[in-house]
Amino acid sequence: MAKGASISGFPEWLPAERVVEQRVIDTLREVFELNGFIGIETRAVEQGSSLLKKGETSKEIYLLSRLQEVGHESDIPVEQRLGLHFDLTVPLSRYVVEHSGALPFPFKRWQIQKVWRGERPQEGRFREFVQADIDVVGDGTLPSHYEVELPLVMVNALERLREFGLPKATVHANNRKLSEGFYRGLGLTDIEGVLREIDKLDKIGPQAVTDLLVETCGATEAQANACLELAQVTAEDGQELIEKFNGLCEIHHIPFDGDEYAMAKEGLDTLSMIIDEARRIRPGSVMADLKIARGLDYYTGSVYETFLEGASDLGSICSGGRYDNLATQGNRKYPGVGLSIGLSRLVSYMLHRAGATASRMSPACVLVAVWDEENRGDSNAIANTLRSRGIAADVAPTAAKLGKQIKYADKLGIPYVWFPNENPENDGSDEVKNIITGDQRPADAQSWQPDTVYAQQTVSINADNR
């Protein structure tokens, strides 16, 4: 067999690391379902035509080919080929259209699944990774109150993950209509281009963005500077946001009675409502940040990015927005709003920077020893009795010396070793040993209970990171 080799961008967790990931998944699912979201799973592949028209660049999409097709892919248009989904929003839009007759609307769904994206691998960024999404999709219309509710659900979920070493999270929100109205008021026409370049601000800096706005979007130096001024606006309450935005409109001579301002005001009113309502329900969780653009072109209203306190180098760990035109069926539209957590990035952060560790790699609480192979049936019976009572148990793989069986349990992190009565015909009893504390005492598989602290796998973080 050929020796395996790691492939850049395709992470594999060790068993104890997988325990941490699973606890994160379980926690997110619990929060999502507490808020009424319904779980689904979609297929891994979509038509190339669906993937390409949703704003993702073709160089980041993985296409599928059968071995006999290699070398002949050019005979098939990319739009007709199958590709791995790069997010969970595009599959959701297709899923909603295909199953609209069987779904309740508004349809609230959660989805935790792998996605594939041909990005350059780096710390915290992978080519194969798990995303955790929540969306609400309406039939024809979707009330704006969901644009407040969903970021707050995500804030609640991320707050729950602080027990695994995640710092405090804050959602930064903007509105595409606000930005577009302002840009049009400046005289700019390539709105999608401007949004894409502004979205790069944190990555490449203001001067590089200014150059791109001038070179690729047809902006003058003055227009580019005005775009950057808008991107610098932040606010934690609605009135502050309105005053700052209107002040910029006055400076740049955008009339308050024009169509451009009317468009911007629609977004301004929604964004003000979002941060005021979020401030009332969960102070400090959501703020207005007008540099948030989101590069994907299917967003039409609110857009969100989420940042961790003290981890600016990690970038946004949860993003999303409102999309009114992503899912359509003839004249029928299914507007939605959703957010997505890059779960693999969070787990990588927890493992390598927050020091999250599992108490043990094995879910078993007890290893039942085997005196000799002739008596393995007795050990299996004890393990089955424990399992029937909800106590996870394993049986030693061989009837080795007890010292080796104990070492095996220790390697797996199993805290208890069960010693069956070696002479059942005598009046002796089984015994169980806590190999962490050294305590050993008689035990009956019908009634014994492990200490609470050792009963389940747990996840803890390095004390220095608390």
From Swiss-Prot:
GO cellular component, one term: cytoplasm
GO biological process: histidyl-tRNA aminoacylation
PANTHER family, alphabetized: HISTIDINE--TRNA LIGASE (PTHR11476:SF7), HISTIDYL-TRNA SYNTHETASE (PTHR11476)
GO molecular function, one term: histidine-tRNA ligase activity
Enzyme Commission designation: 6.1.1.21
Organism field: Bifidobacterium animalis subsp. lactis (strain AD011)
Subunit and partners: Homodimer.
Catalytic activity: tRNA(His) + L-histidine + ATP = L-histidyl-tRNA(His) + AMP + diphosphate + H(+)
SUPFAM superfamilies: Class II aaRS ABD-related, Class II aaRS and biotin synthetases
A Pfam family recorded for this sequence: HGTP_anticodon
Enzyme class: ligase
Localization per Swiss-Prot or TrEMBL: Cytoplasm
Family: Belongs to the class-II aminoacyl-tRNA synthetase family.
Keywords on record: Aminoacyl-tRNA synthetase, ATP-binding, Cytoplasm, Ligase, Nucleotide-binding, Protein biosynthesis
Superkingdom as given in the UniProt entry: Bacteria
Protein name, UniProt field: Histidine--tRNA ligase
